[in-house]
Structure formats: C-alpha cells, structure tokens
Swiss-Prot record:
GO terms for molecular function: transaldolase activity. Transmembrane segments: none annotated. Pathway: Carbohydrate degradation; pentose phosphate pathway; D-glyceraldehyde 3-phosphate and beta-D-fructose 6-phosphate from D-ribose 5-phosphate and D-xylulose 5-phosphate (non-oxidative stage): step 2/3. The active site is at K125 (schiff-base intermediate with substrate). One of its GO terms (cellular component) is cytoplasm. Its EC number is 2.2.1.2. Homodimer. Its main location: cytoplasm. The keyword Aminoacyl-tRNA synthetase does not apply. This is Transaldolase. PANTHER family: TRANSALDOLASE.
Length: 316
C-alpha cells in the first residue's frame, strides 16, 4: 500500500489546487482553492478560456462580481470531480470587515446555488482575523459553513472553536518557514523534522485541544513543505495537500502510522482556554510568528486577487 492510500485510512485527504484536471488521479474527498491558486491556473492555456468566458458572459458587471463568478466556476468544475466539498475564498482585502465578508460569502453561496449545488458542499474560506472569525460565526448561524484560513496560532484556533466554525486550516509549512528563517545557519533540518517540526507541533496542540474539550470544529492541516510533515499528522481530521506532494505520497511505500487520535487527546491533561476580543488581540500580538505570517498571508492573497482582477479587465 502506498503512503497516500495508507494516509486515507486515518485522515480525509484534500487536494489543494485550482488545477482541477489533476484531481481525478488522486481521488481526494475534498478540495481547497485560494486566489493564488486560481491566478496560477488561469495563466495556463487550458484554463484561460474559463476566465474569458466569464468576462464575456457577464460583461458589464462589477469586477468584484466577476471575480466571484470566476472562483465559483472553478469550484463547480472541482465539485463535478470530487464527492465532497470545495473551499472557496472571500476576497482577502475584506479580512478586517465583518459585514463585507458576510455579504461576499452570501453572494458566493448564492452563485453556487444558482448552479444547482447544495451549500453543504461549499466551505467559505475566510482569514482568521478577529473580524473574519466573527463573520464566520454569523455565517455558521445562517447555515453557511466556513473554513478559517491563514491560521498560525493557538489563539486563532481557540477563537474559531468558540465561534463554532466548521473547519480551520492551520498552516504547517509557513510556520516551519518562519522558524527556519529565524534560526538561519543554526537550523538543523533532521533534528527539527517530524514531531519536532514547529508547524507539526502547532497542529497537534490544536487537534488535542479540540478533541479533549469536545469542540466540533474540524482541523485540516495545510501548507506543507514535505511529505514528512504530512505523515507526522496522520490521523488529523483532514489534510489539504498540493498535487506535487500527493504524487510523492502515491509513489512511496514507506509505512504510515496513525499519530493523532481523539481518544489519546482526551487523556492529555489540558486546561480550558477562552478569549474575548481584547484577549485574542493581545495573544496574537504576543506571537511574533503568527502576527507576521497572518499579515504576510493577507497581503499575498490580496495582491493575487488584484492581479486576477487585472487579467479579467484585460480580457474584457
């Protein structure tokens, strides 16, 4: 049995790509997208017609609506291939505006419904800022499920659990990147692998907290740099993995053992934690890595959304 099939025994495998033509070979349950992945896809010849068709068909509509229609088009194509859910992201430029995030999320869901898709097959991705988490709280109360992304800290995870969001995406690789950069020449790759990887440790702590206290929010590890990080999180509710790493897992027969387990998490001695807005902001501010990576991630997604808009305007 290859590593990919072995991993599927313990964890729901999700494909992290806008390149939906790659999906079938890996047979993922779910898929995730983001502005960067959509931007990357539409610059390929096989996907460029989707952008052109969207601009032509809805000519004269506001650019933000065209953006939503394009990402929903990709989502619909993905949902025709996978049996589960697709995560579609709200414009990152709204990350500090609760009301605007809710409005865009509702429009995205309406666009999916207009294509005959049930809202249970869609997760709305929102950056895990305080404002984003409050938007997710409102959306969940209205039956719209959310995926809180750009999650780098325990405080973000706790606040998401309090808001009863459907799913969170803690970013393993970007946490790893930060600590590796900080260490510089002192970084020991072998010593910091597996259970010692700071990104892996972050997800394990969040998973154990959720399972120990019976928090229903799903944990989906994201942003991997190597298959070792993935294997070290076997048993996590879900793991979203880029096609390149899915291929590496499928090509390897190395053993995969379950690492994360809800029963084991319930036996860990943990103290309950809760945050109000002031406590959340202070805890996030105290975490230099999470503060820097959240800001950097929002800037990057916002920049790629702007580039996508430029491509759409050029195609008009």
């Amino acid at each position: 049995m290859n590593q990919l099939d072995a991993l599927k025994q313990y964890t729901t495998v999700v494909a992290d790509t806008g390149d939906f033509k790659q999906l079938a070979q890996f047979q993922p349950q779910d898929a995730t997208t983001n502005p960067s992945l959509i931007l990357k896809a539409v610059q390929k010849p096989e996907y460029a017609p989707l952008l052109k068709d969207c601009v032509t068909r809805w000519h004269g509509r506001a650019i933000d609506e065209l953006m939503d229609r394009l990402i929903v088009r990709f989502g619909c194509e993905i949902l025709s291939i996978i049996p589960g859910r697709v995560s579609t992201e709200v414009d990152a430029r709204l990350s500090f505006d609760t009301a605007a995030t809710v409005a865009r999320a509702e429009r995205i869901v309406e666009l999916y419904q207009a294509e005959g898709l049930h809202i249970d097959r869609v997760l709305i991705k929102i950056a895990a800022t305080w404002e984003g988490i409050q938007a997710a709280r409102q959306l969940e109360q209205r039956g719209i499920h959310t995926n809180l992304t750009l999650l780098f800290s325990f405080a973000q995870a706790v606040a998401c659990g309090q808001a009863k969001v459907q799913l969170i995406s803690p970013f393993v690789g970007r946490i790893y990147d930060w600590y590796k950069k900080q260490a510089g020449a002192n970084w020991d790759e072998a010593a910091m692998a597996g259970a010692n990887d700071p990104g892996v440790q972050s997800v394990r702590a969040i998973y154990n907290h959720y399972k120990h206290f019976g928090i229903g929010t799903e944990v989906m590890g994201a942003s991997f740099r190597n298959t070792g990080q993935i294997v070290a999180l076997a048993g996590c509710d879900l793991l979203t993995i880029a096609p390149e790493l899915l291929a590496q897992l499928a090509a390897s027969d190395a053993p995969v053992a379950r690492v994360l387990d809800p029963e084991a998490a319930r036996r860990v001695a943990l103290q309950p934690v809760q945050y109000d807005e002031a406590g959340f902001r202070y805890a996030l501010n105290a975490d230099a890595m999470a503060t820097e990576k959240l800001a950097e991630g929002i800037r990057a997604f916002a920049a790629d959304a702007a580039k996508l808009e430029q491509l759409m305007q050029a195609a008009a």
